Structures are given as C-alpha cells and as structure tokens.
Amino acid sequence: MKKIFVTTFNKILFDKFAKNLIESFIETNQQLPLYCYVEDDIKLYPKYNNVFFINLFEAQPENKNFFIRNRNKYANYIQKNYLFDAVRFSYKVFAQSDSRKYADHIFFIDADTLFLKQIPDSWFNVCLPNSVFISLYDRLGYYTE
C-alpha cells in the first residue's frame, strides 16, 4: 500500500518555516514522497526530489469556494482568538481529502515540523496498520501550529 507525507502552506509560510521542513526531509533521506498543498502558484516554489507541489484551490475547488464564503465572516472573533479561523484550518482538511487519490496511507506533517532522522518503513506499519483509519486534531493546550 502506498504511503505519503502531506503538508500545507503558502509562500509566506514557506519562506518563514516550511522550507526548513523540506530541507530536513531531504537531509534525513525520507523514503516516502512529500506532497505539499499550496494556496498559490506552484511555480513560486523550488524543485526538489521526491517533493510534489499541488495548488490546493485547483485540486479542491470547493476549498476556494469555502475561502471566499468565509474569509471575512468571523473577522472580529479571529482577531481575538485564532481558533475561530475556520478558513485557516480548512486547508488541512481539504488537502488530506484530496491526497487520498495519491496514496492509501497519509501522514500529515505540520509545515513547522522538522525531520530529525529517517523514519524506518516498519514504523509506518506499526503506527497505521492497513486495517486502521484515523484522523486526530488534538487541541490540548490549544496550540495548533
């Protein structure tokens, strides 16, 4: 069964920290491909081996519709508490849904994460056996990014 890593970011977040995720992915010689869903033109990003950039709004037009409908809907609440920013969190959900067409097992990696060493293939099977489907958006302490 095919396995992939998936993440989301835009050009601003790429320049801020997602480029470090990709560099650590390459330096640690990860064996699974990394699918990066972005909100902007994929031509803005450098080319890397085993890293694929996908425009999220083209792959999932309903995500763009959701963005347009909701981008200003809760602006007052979002300024006070980012947890109300449904648009911000929708990118992860739409990317994970779209990525199912590329693999049977999807491992979502936040863009501000770093790989410290290569993850052995055996770990993936222990973490997510073939008979399991799980999605966890744990919010203990409310730190989300």
Protein language model regions, located:
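Short, polar loop motifs at secondary-structure junctions
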Residues: 37-44, 117, 139
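Short aromatic/hydrophobic "clamp" motif used to bind/position activated sugar donors
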Residues: 106
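Short, charged/polar "capping" segments at the starts of alpha-helices
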Residues: 14-16, 40-47, 143
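Conserved donor-nucleotide/metal-binding helix-loop-beta segment in metal-dependent transferases, i.e.
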Residues: 115-145
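The conserved acidic donor/metal-binding loop of glycosyltransferases
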Residues: 110-114
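N-proximal low-complexity "stem/linker" segments adjacent to membrane-targeting elements
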Residues: 1-19
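Active-site-proximal specificity loops/subdomain of glycosyltransferases
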Residues: 43-100
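Short, acidic, metal-binding catalytic loop of nucleotide-sugar glycosyltransferases
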Residues: 23-32
